[in-house]
């Protein structure tokens, strides 16, 4: 409800001349912000806003009064127009009055064209900040996205665009909307090279946003590499570097098993800082291709984000799939061949057929070297052949009978070694040769 004092002041405005009315409105705005009772702020400022736009004051006078209204609203924040310094009462006033001002501006084409800078300020410093303080991050992002850029009346720098888009991206990511965030990240990629060198903090935010989007999109290998690069940056505190290193390890663990992941794991494992992190135990086992127990996996899962525990199209979680594939690689280091059912038991799967399906997919994708005998239900791991990570590179080019031929070769080599030893003994001790044996 409008206070009686403001109502009386507004009633006197028609008595003022057209030239003196801007000053009259400015006096009313000052009266409102000076009042010790904030309960009428929103209603009083909205009443003044309505009265200002009902008058035909002209663009110049209206612009000046809009600036006064914006300053009056910003003065309500204890530490400036940032989400951290805005209480719930202030954010509500900013939203109510800010939207009212903006609606009046947009309803008048002349003002909408002429007050572009003021529109941007309302969106950026009032409405978006208020939404952020109320944890309405998607609303904040949409508000920021409405700010006009590069109109004929307003030119902005690449630095301004980059700061704005980073803020939009971070708001969308707060609500786990990676799809919308990626739209603005792609825009940012086109200009980041123009501002990155002179703005290391902005460049860091760009890299972190890219890593978070890759993480949310389950591009875990790329996310791990991005997080690790950030963890080496001297621009952030040691605690933050360790946190991003931890995120790099988590993403590497969740990445599809295979040569590319092995290279990333090696890099993380050899980083001396990793040993101080809680995730080092599982990192070490994965790097050394050791089998992971269910209890270890469950403990690791407690530190993952919700999207990292999401269910995939086949009903399993990303973590469960990653662990099965890792343990399959570990089994390939222990056995040269194994039956479908036995492998399924090792991997904790319901059936051997599921084990065959996973193995076949990894071989086809070049993440595991081996071959499958579907008739005898046996999987042969090729210990001397490393998959490259390229599709099809894991398929062995030799027939399944390789192991039998390998055994034959070993027996033949043993026989040849035995014969050579016998010949050497006979040369050294000819008396051991029985009488009548040829050559004696």
UniProtKB/Swiss-Prot annotation:
One GO cellular component, as annotated: cytoplasm
Primary location recorded for the protein, binned into one broad class: cytoplasm
Record-annotated PCI domain positions: 216-386
SUPFAM superfamilies: Winged helix' DNA-binding domain (SSF46785)
Localization (cell): Cytoplasm; Nucleus
Assembly with partners or alone: Component of the COP9 signalosome (CSN) complex.
Protein name: COP9 signalosome complex subunit 4
Species: Neurospora crassa (strain ATCC 24698 / 74-OR23-1A / CBS 708.71 / DSM 1257 / FGSC 987)
């Amino acid at each position: 409800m409008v206070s009686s004092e403001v109502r009386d002041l507004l009633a006197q405005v028609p008595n003022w001349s057209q030239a003196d009315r801007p000053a009259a409105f400015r006096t009313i705005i000052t009266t409102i912000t000076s009042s010790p009772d904030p309960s009428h702020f929103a209603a009083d400022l909205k009443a003044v806003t309505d009265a200002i736009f009902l008058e035909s004051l002209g663009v110049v006078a209206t612009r000046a009064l809009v600036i006064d209204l914006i300053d009056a609203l910003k003065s309500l924040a204890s530490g400036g127009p940032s989400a951290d310094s805005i209480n719930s009462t202030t954010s509500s006033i900013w939203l109510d009055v800010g939207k009212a001002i903006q609606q009046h501006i947009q309803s008048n084409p002349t003002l909408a064209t002429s007050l572009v800078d003021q529109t941007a300020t309302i969106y950026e410093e009032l409405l978006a900040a208020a939404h952020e303080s109320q944890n309405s991050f998607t609303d904040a992002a949409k508000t920021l996205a409405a700010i006009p850029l590069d109109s004929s009346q307003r030119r902005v720098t690449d630095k301004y665009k980059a700061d704005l888009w980073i803020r939009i991206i971070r708001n969308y990511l707060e609500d786990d909307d990676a799809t919308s965030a990626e739209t603005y990240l792609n825009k940012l990629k086109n200009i980041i090279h123009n501002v990155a060198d002179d703005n290391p903090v902005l460049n860091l935010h760009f890299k972190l946003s890219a890593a978070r989007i890759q993480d949310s999109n389950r591009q875990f290998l790329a996310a791990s590499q991005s997080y690790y690069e950030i963890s080496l940056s001297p621009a952030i505190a040691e605690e933050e570097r360790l946190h991003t290193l931890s995120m790099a390890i988590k993403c590497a663990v969740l990445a599809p098993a295979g040569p590319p992941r092995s290279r990333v794991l090696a890099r993380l494992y050899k980083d001396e800082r990793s040993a101080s992190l809680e995730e080092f135990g599982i990192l070490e086992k994965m790097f050394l291709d050791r089998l992971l127990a269910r209890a270890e996996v469950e403990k690791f899962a407690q530190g993952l984000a919700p999207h990292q525990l999401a269910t995939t199209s086949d009903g399993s979680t990303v973590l469960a799939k990653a662990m099965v594939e890792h343990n399959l690689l570990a089994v390939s280091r222990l056995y040269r061949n194994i039956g479908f059912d036995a492998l399924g038991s090792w991997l904790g799967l319901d059936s051997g057929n599921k084990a065959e399906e996973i193995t076949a997919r990894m071989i086809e994708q070049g993440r595991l070297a081996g071959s499958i005998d579907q008739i005898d239900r046996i999987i042969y791991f090729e210990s001397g052949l490393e998959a490259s990570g390229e599709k099809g590179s894991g398929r062995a080019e030799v027939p399944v009978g390789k192991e039998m031929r390998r055994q034959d070769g070993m027996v033949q080599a043993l026989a040849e070694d035995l014969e050579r030893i016998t010949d050497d003994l006979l040369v050294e001790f000819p008396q051991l040769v029985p009488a009548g044996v040829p050559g004696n």
